Every structure is written in C-alpha cells, then in structure tokens.
Amino acid sequence: MVLSQRQRDELNRAIADYLRSNGYEEAYSVFKKEAELDMNEELDKKYAGLLEKKWTSVIRLQKKVMELESKLNEAKEEINIGGPIGQKRDPKEWIPRPPEKYALSGHRSPVTRVIFHPVFSVIVSASEDATIKVWDHETGDFERTLKGHTDSVQDISFDHTGKLLASCSADMTIKLWDFQGFECIRTMHGHDHNVSSVAIMPNGDHIVSASRDKTIKMWEVATGYCVKTFTGHREWVRMVRPNQDGTLIASSSNDQTVRVWVVATKECKAELREHEHVVECISWAPESAHPTILEATGSETKKSGKPGPFLLSGSRDKTIKMWDVSIGMCLMTLVGHDNWVRGVLVHPGGKYIVSCADDKTLRIWDYKNKRCTKTLSAHEHFVTSLDFHKTAPYVVTGSVDQTVKVWECR
C-alpha cells in the first residue's frame, strides 16, 4: 500500500517524536536529517505519542478482526448445520445454537433464576433487585413486574398447572403468587436466614424451601403452615428439588454434600459426598434419560424393577456429577467448566446434559461419551441459571450481567 506525501510526512514526524522521546538522540538526528524534517514545538505537540497510539490501535483492531472471524466461522457452521442435513435432526437431539433469539433487559441487578411457564409462552425471572419479571419468550416482550419481596429474590417455581408461582428471598420469606391475577396470596415466615431455594411439590399441595439456616422446610399451600422440617446439613442449603413423583427431595449445600430425603418419614436416604467445594445446583434426571444413563454408565443396579433414580449435581469445584441415588454412588464426573457450575439439567430428549457456569458459558454434554459437544459464550458475566422448555425448542439463561437470554434449539 503506497502512502500519500501527507501520510508519509505524518509517519516520519511520529517516528522522529518516538526516537527523541525515548532517548535515541543519535538515531533521531540521523533520521531527521535523512527525512528532511523541519521540527518545531507546535508540530511536536501534535505528534507526541502518536506512533504508540497507532500501534496499540492496530493491535486492538487485529484482536477485533480475529473475534469477528471466529464469530463468522461459528455462524457459517450453524448455517451448515441448519441446512438440509440439520433439518433431518431428531428433535430429541436439538440443542441451543448461537446467537440468542432475544436478550431481555429490565432487571437492575443480577438475575438469580429463570424458568419457563409450564403452559404459556412465558418466562419468569428473579433478581437481586427484589423483583420478579414476566416475559413472553415468543415475542421477547416484557409483560409485568411482581413486587413484594424486600431483598434479593433467590428462586422461583411453578406448580404443574402454572396457576401458582412460589418465590423465596433473602428477606427470609416465601411468597405464593396467583399467576392469573399476578397477586401475592400468601407469605410464609419460619426460616431464620436467607431462603435460597423453593420448589412446589408435584402434587401442588406442598412447597419445599431451603435456607442458609441449614434447614429444609415443607409448607402446606392451602394454609401456609410449616408441616415438616428436615435437618442434617451442616452448612447453608443452596438448592432443594423434589423428584417426579414427590416421594423424595434432594438438597445441596455449602457442606459439599448432596442429600436425598424420604418425604414421608423425613429420613435421609442418601448422603452423596464426592464434591470438593460448595454444591450449587441439583436436578433429577427424567425417566426419558434412564435408558441412555444405563447405557452410558454400564450401571447394573436394579436389574429387576425400575432403574435409578438418577440425580445431577453441579459444584464450585467446576465439575458436574451424576449419581445413582438407590446405591448412593457417583456414576460419572464431567470436567470442562472453568469456574463454578451454577445450573445443570438433563435435555428433555435424554441424550444430553446442559449446564451453565461462572465461566460465562452454556455447555452441552454428550454424557454417553463423557464429552462436551458444544460451548456457547452465553453472557458478558457469570451465568447463574438456565431452564429448558419441556416441549418447545427453547433454552433460557440468566446472568449477573442483568439480562435474560432466550436461545433457539435446532
């Protein structure tokens, strides 16, 4: 590329300034003479530090070009996958693909939990800004804000009909919302510290909650009374989740364990210990995944009768573990995240595990082969939560960057 006379003159003056300001006096004198430069104070000011600025801006541009080339290659790959071959892909194998369909903004603090409505095309998000927001995931429209908590909302859960929403907060309360009228119909008090997790039981009659007070409590939906307290964890209980038929609940804790409890007797059926740090998240594997799990793990447990149940856990030790609850054994460990794992789910098709973490990624794991098949750079900050729609091809994520993102699967 040939420079114009003016550009050449500017470059020469910038080089001369660089040589002089860095003490290369002899080189400066020779260069000034050979380039026939007439340097003066006014011109000197204009070109001071110009060469360094140009150099750093070139490096910055090169980095940006590399990033854009990487994104372009990723987009080309996605287009190829989404072409005629991709269209033949079994819906059970659909996974989230970049870029996101929507990035929803509105929360003023980190998003702590995101969930899909079981019936309507609605997403609900909870945040440290003490609000719950409702969005339409098909249009990306914001619908409304539910206010009532006075501190960070930590978790939210629908009943199977989608008519009731439960929420819990660092304000030490659990609230029950009529999701048709968007009104708080009950507030439950009883925990002595931050309530970190809540879930409505499958029968819809009870709610379970977990707290920093080291307990798990069960509440009656009709009255708001606490009917059971499960004790055993030695530290903050981070998450609680019931299994599909509501006979068991699983909990994870800062004490680095996962516990499984029999609801009827409050007995701790299993204490699962292999994580080396706080266990942030848990989820039960649906029955649709059991055949793949048995094939993947070569598990010979329960040859007679139903296999499992199987449980997933994600930890600050950066790993995901799969457990056979019936024998209290870890079946596999998935390693790949570069920071705390904050969310983990089995894909509705049963073939994949989907996880999110503080490394800002969403990862899809082919657990049969124990490898990560896809990594999405999902957010600008820690990814705190994810949910997979049970029937429609969508995944939703929430982040410390205060956004909620909807991802289309194909």
Swiss-Prot record:
Matching Pfam families, A to Z? LisH_PAC1 (PF24951), WD40 (PF00400)
Where the record annotates domain LisH, the positions are 7-39
Task: Extract the InterPro entries matched here.
Answer: Coatomer_complex_subunit (IPR050844), Dynein_regulator_LIS1 (IPR017252), G-protein_beta_WD-40_rep (IPR020472), LIS1_N (IPR037190), LisH (IPR006594), PAC1-like_LisH-like_dom (IPR056795), WD40/YVTN_repeat-like_dom_sf (IPR015943), WD40_repeat_CS (IPR019775)
Parts forming coiled coils:
56-83
Q: How does it assemble?
A: Can self-associate. Component of the cytosolic PAF-AH (I) heterotetrameric enzyme, which is composed of PAFAH1B1 (beta), PAFAH1B2 (alpha2) and PAFAH1B3 (alpha1) subunits. The catalytic activity of the enzyme resides in the alpha1 (PAFAH1B3) and alpha2 (PAFAH1B2) subunits, whereas the beta subunit (PAFAH1B1) has regulatory activity. Trimer formation is not essential for the catalytic activity. Interacts with dynein, dynactin, nde1 and ndel1.
Q: Which family does it belong to?
A: Belongs to the WD repeat LIS1/nudF family.
Q: What does this protein do?
A: Regulatory subunit (beta subunit) of the cytosolic type I platelet-activating factor (PAF) acetylhydrolase (PAF-AH (I)), an enzyme that catalyzes the hydrolyze of the acetyl group at the sn-2 position of PAF and its analogs and participates in PAF inactivation. Regulates the PAF-AH (I) activity in a catalytic dimer composition-dependent manner. Positively regulates the activity of the minus-end directed microtubule motor protein dynein. May enhance dynein-mediated microtubule sliding by targeting dynein to the microtubule plus end.
What is recorded about the domains? Answer: Dimerization mediated by the LisH domain may be required to activate dynein.
Record-given protein name: Lissencephaly-1 homolog A
Q: Which gene encodes it?
A: pafah1b1a
